[in-house]
Amino acid sequence: YRNVRKNKVSKKSGTNHRDILDISKMSIEEVIEYVRKRLENYNPQPVRRKEIPKENGKTRPLGIPTIEDRLIQQCIKQVLEPICEAKFYHHSYGFRPNRSTHHAVSRAMTLMNKTKLHYVVDIDIKGFFDNVDHSKLIKQMWSLGIQDKNLICVINKMLKAEIKGVGVPNKGTPQGGILSPLLANIVLNELDWWVSSQWEAFPTRKNYSKIRTLKSGKAYLDHSNKYRAMKESTKLKRMFIVRYADDFKIFCSSYEDAQKIFIATKQWLSERLHLEVSPDKSKITNLRKNYTDFL
């Protein structure tokens, strides 16, 4: 309840015209009992659709569940988040505990300046939140260890909650739901690890990594020897991904490498996640000659 109340959307009412102030009139015991009974045979209430204006003149659809459904989504999030955090890629920064846009930008600057990766692949996923494949998402949750069938059934019902004035969606996870950012990270976590497996997480026979200590006393794993050995003994190309929600960049060392990973990533997103890339918003940038927007 406290986490829902902190959310700026908490004072916005759903289709039943109730908000967080109505929930605050209930005792803790009443809230717990309400959630328990709803989950016994859960059916979400219709979602309110609201169009949010964008700078380019277009609008972004926001799906606002009822306050009661947001409360249940928060309960589920608090159970799932620790499980997912243990499996998420370490350079994904969006909507995660103790991570922010500053961390994402700092990582991007490190790759550009210290690692000398001056070519960046910018890929914009067309309408990401509106095009998430429900069946694929459920399979990804199962792979992460979320295998309680009752819980999966509840989440599946949330995904297919009726949007008032639109109907029942067959894909997508509406922006405005408390659970949506976590589900988005579950979907794109597979992309993170796929890109990482091409270089950063590529397995080697010998363990080259060493534990080193910063002046601050913080320990970290140094992979520089591993990367040096891979560069000398393989034809693999250096590449690193930095992601914040559905906004991500892949850093490469040459234009040729960037072209290959650009084509491969578009194909992978289409075949694995059934997502399309916006051709007019996706490009390769030489950072020594041009700038790139991030967040």
Regions found by a protein language model. Name each.
Residues 2-9, 78-91:
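Charged boundary/loop elements
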Residues 15, 78, 123-125:
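Residues immediately flanking
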Residues 22-44:
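Amphipathic alpha-helical blocks
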